[in-house]
A protein has these predicted regions:
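Residue-level detector of beta-propeller blades
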Residues: 60-63, 81, 91-93, 160, ...
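Acidic/hydrophobic-patterned starts of short beta strands in beta-sheet-rich repeat architectures
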Residues: 67-74, 119-132, 203-211
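Structural signature of eukaryotic scaffold interfaces centered on beta-propeller domains
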Residues: 56-67, 108-121, 195-203
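Bacterial N-terminal signal peptides that target proteins for export
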Residues: 1-12, 18-21
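Acidic, small-residue rich beta-repeat scaffolds with periodic aromatic anchors
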Residues: 26-54, 140-145, 151-256
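N-terminal "first-domain core" detector
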Residues: 45-86
Length: 256
């Protein structure tokens, strides 16, 4: 009986140590930042020789390293992944996302948000941001919407989230008379804004943390009251909803 108990205890210890080892080596999923100025001139030359598309633009390359020590580069709509060694760099994969040309009259543009989003270990996505602005007498707005693209091993991309609210800031004139200016004490606009913070929770599950703020001028005739709100949404990346479940007034898309 004693032998049996000792054997069972050993099994429990082995199981526990295996669990601890798994916990130690299962690195948490982290969003990684592309940054400029991390490559030497020599390194940049070596990389550009392998993927000339990266260096056709005059913008400085943005780079990062993932936990497996592969090097990732971002330049405009071009993304590339390289193995690193003492002898240099070897191209592993590359992707091209076609970005819309900036239209000055429409005040709109697209860019890749300089972060690498983990879907699961060694499986990543990027966000393409559509941005536009509008202006009107005494006010205006800037709006950003995000679409997320998986970077597949084949070199292709797959869009799995489309046109989600990402950020906006808007102000609307509230003072129209001398009395308004006096009563508002210099605060002559209604202002509201929305921000988004994304946190990976586990493989194929992200949490979208929306934060909304409304600041109403004392001179406003909108009937609104100043307000701050938040909503945390768990998004299953296998079947993301068409749009996030946030209040309609938080989802400003422009006056149209």
């Amino acid at each position: 009986m004693l032998k049996y108990k000792m054997g069972l205890g050993g099994m429990i210890l082995i199981g526990a140590s295996a669990y601890i080892s798994a916990s130690v080596f299962a690195a948490p999923l982290q969003i990684l930042d592309f940054k400029k100025g991390q490559l030497s001139a020599t390194e940049q030359t070596q990389l550009c020789e392998q993927v000339k598309e990266l260096c056709q633009q005059r913008t400085q390359l943005q780079s990062l390293k993932t936990p497996d020590q592969t090097l990732w580069l971002l330049s405009e709509g071009n993304i590339a992944q390289f193995a690193t060694s003492t002898t240099g760099f070897k191209l592993l994969k590359q992707w091209r996302i076609q970005l819309a040309a900036s239209e000055e009259m429409a005040r709109s543009s697209q860019y890749i948000f300089p972060k690498l989003f983990p879907m699961e270990q060694n499986r990543y996505a990027v966000a393409v941001i559509d941005t536009f602005s509008e202006s009107y007498s005494g006010g205006g707005a800037s709006v950003e919407r995000a679409s997320f693209y998986e970077l597949k091993d084949s070199g292709k991309t797959h869009r799995f989230i489309e046109n989600y609210p990402f950020h906006f800031y808007r102000m609307i004139r509230a003072c129209f008379s001398e009395q308004d200016y006096e009563s508002s004490k210099g605060k002559c606009h209604d202002e509201d804004s929305l921000g988004l913070d994304i946190r990976p929770i586990k493989p194929m599950l992200w949490q979208f943390r929306y934060r909304y703020s409304l600041d109403v001028s004392p001179a406003s005739d909108s009937g609104e009251k100043s307000f701050k709100g938040s909503r945390n949404l768990n998004i299953d990346l296998n079947k993301a909803p068409e749009q996030p479940n946030i209040p309609e007034e938080w989802d400003y898309e422009g006056a149209g």
